């Protein structure tokens, strides 16, 4: 992806690896080839096709140029964040005795279910994929216990857990602006925020379902959507036809502006049922904004008591919003920040480097 949680995680991990004295090289798919030195290390882009219907996702589909690049780079560690098109890299690394780690950024059966594959068939397909991955890679890194379950199910012994993190300096409660909140709320009493890719597996329609349910119950609520994707046209059309007060901002590339939005909102919605961590929800918590998250995902494990886990319906998400709004505002915002402070990037980088059995970074502390 060109944006979103995975891109954020790769950038933050790269900066952490660099600060710990390593020489990280990130290889990503893109439209054209490039090779840049950045604050997260060296970033090499290889041309990769766009997956139809995903609204911009690209993959490293051509093995020959990537294999040649890996041979030229001669890495002493390999970390892979694509469990589909790059599965072959585990065997490549084994043959060369290079310790390789695969990071499970999503559950295979969870993604298959969101695409409509029946539960048992999804589990069987996921088990086949995961057995091969567990054999091919020295370690499998899962960011939550929830993500780890599908590997526990097959008896994998090389699974370690390493949570992701959040930028506690950029994402902070002090960014909350009553002026911005009033402008985005457009006269409503409650401002909801959805920061998500607008694609099938993220279930963004649940946010509109919740908004409609809350308004039917007499609450003056509006919704801001920060994100883009293939479902955007249908969501915009629905909001217009049902006269729902929704602002579609599209992709917000300015991370500072996004943090301002996350701090201004009263509640953040995270309806994706296959999320293995949910960085945008964690960023909202760091800004002091509580979260209603899908009970089917890993997010209840991340948000804890600072949020509400809801079944995957608009009515249940609306109930979760009401539950959070019933808590005193100072208490719910303080609880959100306190929860986020358990997930700083320094701890994340330390855990990932430990999975690689590599040199660890020096201590750091996040700001408020």
Where on the chain are the PLM-derived regions?
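Conserved donor-binding/catalytic core segment of Leloir-type glycosyltransferases
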Residues: 180, 185-212
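Conserved acidic donor-binding segment of nucleotide-sugar-dependent glycosyltransferases
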Residues: 305-315, 323-329
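Aromatic "clamp/platform" in nucleotide-sugar-dependent glycosyltransferases that forms part
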Residues: 273
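Nucleotide-activated donor-binding/catalytic signature segment of Leloir-type glycosyltransferases, i.e.
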Residues: 233-252
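A charged, aromatic-enriched C-terminal amphipathic alpha-helix characteristic of glycosyltransferases
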Residues: 178, 330-357
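Short hydrophobic beta-strand element within catalytic cores of glycosyltransferases
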Residues: 290-293
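Donor nucleotide-sugar binding/catalytic pocket of nucleotide-sugar-dependent glycosyltransferases
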Residues: 28, 44-47, 123, 127-176
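Short alpha-helical donor nucleotide-sugar binding micro-motif in glycosyltransferases
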Residues: 251, 259-265
């Amino acid at each position: 992806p060109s944006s979103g949680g995975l891109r954020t995680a790769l950038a933050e991990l790269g900066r952490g690896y660099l600060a710990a004295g390593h020489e990280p090289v990130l290889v990503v798919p893109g439209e054209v080839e490039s090779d840049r030195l950045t604050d997260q290390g060296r970033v090499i882009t290889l041309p990769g096709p766009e997956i139809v219907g995903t609204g911009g996702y690209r993959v490293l589909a051509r093995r020959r140029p990537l294999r040649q690049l890996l041979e030229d780079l001669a890495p002493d560690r390999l970390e892979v964040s694509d469990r589909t098109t790059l599965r072959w890299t585990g065997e490549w690394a084994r043959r060369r005795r290079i310790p390789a780690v695969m990071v499970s950024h999503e559950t295979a059966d969870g993604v298959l279910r969101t695409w409509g594959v029946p539960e048992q068939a999804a589990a069987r397909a996921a088990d086949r994929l995961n057995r091969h991955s567990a054999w091919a890679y020295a370690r499998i890194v899962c960011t939550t216990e929830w993500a780890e379950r599908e590997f526990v199910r097959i008896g994998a012994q090389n699974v370690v857990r390493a949570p992701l993190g959040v930028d506690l300096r950029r994402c902070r409660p002090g960014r909350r602006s009553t002026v911005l909140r009033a402008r985005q709320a457009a006269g409503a009493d409650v401002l909801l925020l959805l920061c998500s890719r607008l694609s099938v597996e993220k279930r963004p329609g649940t946010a509109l379902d919740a908004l409609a349910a809350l308004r039917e119950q007499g609450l003056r609520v509006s919704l801001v959507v920060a994100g883009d994707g293939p479902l955007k046209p249908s969501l915009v059309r629905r909001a217009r036809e049902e006269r729902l007060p929704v602002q579609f901002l599209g992709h917000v590339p300015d991370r500072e502006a996004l943090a301002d939005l996350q701090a201004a909102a009263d509640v953040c919605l995270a309806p994706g049922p296959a999320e293995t961590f949910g960085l945008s929800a964690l960023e909202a918590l760091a800004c002091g904004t509580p979260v209603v998250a899908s009970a089917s995902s890993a997010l209840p494990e991340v948000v804890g008591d600072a949020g509400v886990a809801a079944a995957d319906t608009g009515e249940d998400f609306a109930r979760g919003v009401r539950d959070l709004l019933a808590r005193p505002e100072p208490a719910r915002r303080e609880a959100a920040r306190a929860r986020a402070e358990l997930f700083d990037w320094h701890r994340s980088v330390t855990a990932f480097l430990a999975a690689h059995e590599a040199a660890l970074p020096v201590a750091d502390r996040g700001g408020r």
